[in-house]
Amino acid sequence: MEKIKVALVSLGCDKNRIDSELMLYKLNEEAELVKDPKEAQVIIVNTCGFIETAKEESINTILQMASYKKTHNCKVLVVTGCLTQRYKGELKELIPEMDIMLGVNDYDKLLESIKVFLKSGEKSFYHKYSDTKINEGNRILTTPTYTAYVRIAEGCNNFCTYCAIPRIRGKYRSRKKENILKEVENLAKQGVKEIILIAQDTTMYGIDIYGKKVLHELLRDISKVEGVKWIRLLYCYPEEITKELIEEIKNNDKVCKYLDLPIQQISNSVLKRMGRKTTKETIINIIKKLRKEIEGITLRTSLIVGFPGETEGEFSELKEFVSDVKLDKLGVFKYSKEEGTSAALMEEQIDEEIKEKREEEIMILQQSISKDINKEKIGKTYEVIVEGTKEDMYYGRNYEMSPEIDGEIYFEKDENVKIGDIIKVKVTHSLEYDLIGVVYNELSK
């Protein structure tokens, strides 16, 4: 393929981002990558098909990119990702402007499909389902140079009643430890300091290929890689957290004292309807244990409100939990009725208006909690990775803050500080979600 201009639009989660980065690396061998789709002759849209709003965004983006065939330089429109995997037949008819469609296991066919279309005009539509394949290899990072996501497993075995991911991504399959370590070593050589481990469920890592959960061993091995400063864990199911994992987080200085626990709900009756493999008691006990064992740990969660049949009593139980437990970070999603899931067939679907009201109530409650938690940080000093500038301020994150989903720390510009540096910042003021501070030196003690 001659050096044709290619742009890739990546939607959805950071697991999708990794697929996009893998595609970019392959494309870069024979194409010129451009950021602006209006300049591109080939446009690739890597879609999300998880919930209704994500599907709408994906379809709108595809249609917008398709319009560039008339208004700009686009000759080839490629659509990939979860939406194509989930709705392969419907999309083909709905959007005839698509020239190439690839499922989540077909990225190795990307370059060849583009070449064939440019030569003959022959369209390609692939959507292979796989319970064995894992997309891995070299990537071109779309994150800042100091941070990278590393996928340690693909797929999911949980089959929660509201979720379509196992039907899209297949069963849970861990990557080999040596492959992950090789990737981390390469990233560290590129200057990456923060490694963020992701999967549909990171806590189950290794169960399928090693016969036991070995996330703690993986953390220990990654921490030995020269250049890695922070290791962050996302998507940790509370019921799968082992004592070995707790010990490793506690004792390993490179592992951020931060855990993302996607509990989704707290009422046992709702958890049962969701098909979750845990209970209210288990969730509360693991939170208590983590706080007791790991000093200064930050806990984040995500909740779903408006699940089918959610009563006022069950919602009040959720509010009481949020108020009593006071998690450091919290996000709320309205239940989305997804085709092909058993929850979509449940009776007592909740009105959208009620969902919105419940979402707002939880967020108002959490805003107050977050404000109080942040006040306690005034006077404390943190290591901060510097991310950028806004007007006359620098901003960055400490170990308590994951990129994009959590707050930031702002501080005055310092001529000795560069983007990507890890420096010490002393907190002087607090807001609901963000902190304000000064670069720590002898004068700011």
From Swiss-Prot:
Single GO term (MF): protein methylthiotransferase activity
Catalytic activity: L-aspartate(89)-[ribosomal protein uS12]-hydrogen + (sulfur carrier)-SH + AH2 + 2 S-adenosyl-L-methionine = 3-methylsulfanyl-L-aspartate(89)-[ribosomal protein uS12]-hydrogen + (sulfur carrier)-H + 5'-deoxyadenosine + L-methionine + A + S-adenosyl-L-homocysteine + 2 H(+)
SMART domains, per the entry: Elp3
Cofactor details (free text): Binds 2 [4Fe-4S] clusters. One cluster is coordinated with 3 cysteines and an exchangeable S-adenosyl-L-methionine.
InterPro entries: Elp3/MiaA/NifB-like_rSAM (IPR006638), Methylthiotransferase (IPR005839), Methylthiotransferase_CS (IPR020612), Methylthiotransferase_N (IPR013848), Methylthiotransferase_N_sf (IPR038135), NA-bd_OB-fold (IPR012340), Ribosomal_uS12_MeSTrfase_RimO (IPR005840), rSAM (IPR007197)
Gene3D superfamilies: Methylthiotransferase, N-terminal domain (3.40.50.12160), Nucleic acid-binding proteins (2.40.50.140), tm_1862 like domain (3.80.30.20)
A biological process from GO: tRNA modification
SUPFAM superfamilies listed in its UniProt record: Radical SAM enzymes
Amino acids binding [4Fe-4S] cluster 1: 13, 48, 82
Primary location: cytoplasm
GO CC, alphabetical: cytosol
Reported cofactor(s): [4Fe-4S] cluster
The MTTase N-terminal domain, residue ranges: 4-119
Residue positions binding [4Fe-4S] cluster 2: 156, 160, 163
Pfam families in UniProt: Radical_SAM, TRAM_2, UPF0004
Annotated ranges, domain TRAM: 375-441
Top-level EC class as recorded in UniProt: transferase
All residue ranges annotated as the Radical SAM core domain in the record: 142-372
Keywords assigned: 4Fe-4S, Cytoplasm, Iron, Iron-sulfur, Metal-binding, S-adenosyl-L-methionine, Transferase
Cellular localization per UniProt: Cytoplasm
This enzyme's EC code(s): 2.8.4.4
Database matches in CDD domains: Radical_SAM
Function: Catalyzes the methylthiolation of an aspartic acid residue of ribosomal protein uS12.
Family note: Belongs to the methylthiotransferase family. RimO subfamily.
Protein name per the record: Ribosomal protein uS12 methylthiotransferase RimO
Organism: Clostridium botulinum (strain Hall / ATCC 3502 / NCTC 13319 / Type A)
